A protein has these predicted regions:
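Divalent metal-cofactor coordination and adjacent catalytic microenvironments
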Residues: 1-269
Length: 269
């Protein structure tokens, strides 16, 4: 049975700091609100804001200029692109928009502007790569204090556990690990997160963490904090306190500033 990927766009500690909470009494409830707020942001924008390693299938386009393939998703980097004619070389296509990811479409060179498919154009194109809005990461300052020699181990020892927070998506070598708990220097994680493969890691390996876009983090903080504080007010449809306007969506309050932020982050195509 596959374990679902975890993506939080704010850590538990960061939300508690925002709310001025130091006790652990409501940690389970706060985690649920972070999870729900992060999923809400992804659902409304149609985007993921952590990198995900995945294989995606596409119908071969017909009649588009230069064989333009619109991905409907954010592509950060390509491992391979194949159609029924085999693997494409990196020099046989361009990724758009030019110069920087995330990419939203693939165009073939003018000299070979059609995709190859045999019996059907459906799912004739396969793209393996890293998907998502961004892949920014920081060095946590911590390292592995002892090798992570098992691909199934759910804990590791960090050189300084105080530098790691619950809810972070860590990167060690090429594996993503989602932090579910920290006790002193012992870190509990979900292995092989977001499509990466659980692997062994050497002692002293650098521990990085993915950093979401600031607007995304702020939106999740506002939503999770608001839902925690106003969790018993679901029957109200809208409310204004001074300049702070809130609309209720499916019984959950969503500030206008969050709605505006998510609208800006939603792609046009």
């Amino acid at each position: 049975m596959a374990v679902r990927d975890r993506r939080w766009y704010v850590s538990l500690d960061a939300l508690k700091n925002e709310l001025g909470i130091t006790a652990t009494t409501h940690d389970a409830k706060l985690k649920r609100y972070i999870e729900r707020a992060s999923a809400y942001v992804e659902r409304v924008t149609g985007r993921t804001f952590h990198p995900v390693t995945a294989t995606r299938y596409f119908d071969a386009p017909v009649g588009t200029p230069r064989g333009a393939l619109y991905l409907g998703d954010d592509l950060l980097s390509v491992t391979s692109i194949t159609d029924d004619g085999g693997a494409l070389t990196a020099t046989s296509y361009f990724l758009y928009p030019l110069n920087r990811p995330p990419y939203r479409r693939v165009e073939l060179l003018a000299t070979s502007d059609t995709w190859t498919f045999t019996d059907s154009r459906q799912q004739a194109i396969i793209i393996v790569g890293t998907w998502g809005y961004s892949a920014s990461y920081d060095d946590t300052g911590a390292t592995l204090n002892g090798a992570l020699s098992s691909t199934t181990a759910a804990t590791f020892t960090a050189s300084d556990g105080s530098l790691i927070e619950v809810g972070w998506s860590l990167l060690i070598d090429s594996e993503q690990l989602f932090v579910t708990g920290v006790s002193s220097n012992t870190v509990t994680v979900q292995r092989g997160n977001n499509g990466t493969t659980a692997a062994t890691h050497s002692t002293g390996a650098t521990i990085y963490r993915y950093v979401p876009e600031p607007d995304v983090t702020e939106a999740v903080v506002l939503l999770a904090a608001l839902w925690y504080q106003w969790r018993d007010m679901g029957g109200i449809q809208s409310q204004r306190i001074g300049d702070y306007a809130v609309t209720y969506v499916d019984g959950w309050p969503v500030p206008e500033i969050v709605r505006d932020t998510l609208a800006r982050l939603t792609p046009l195509v």
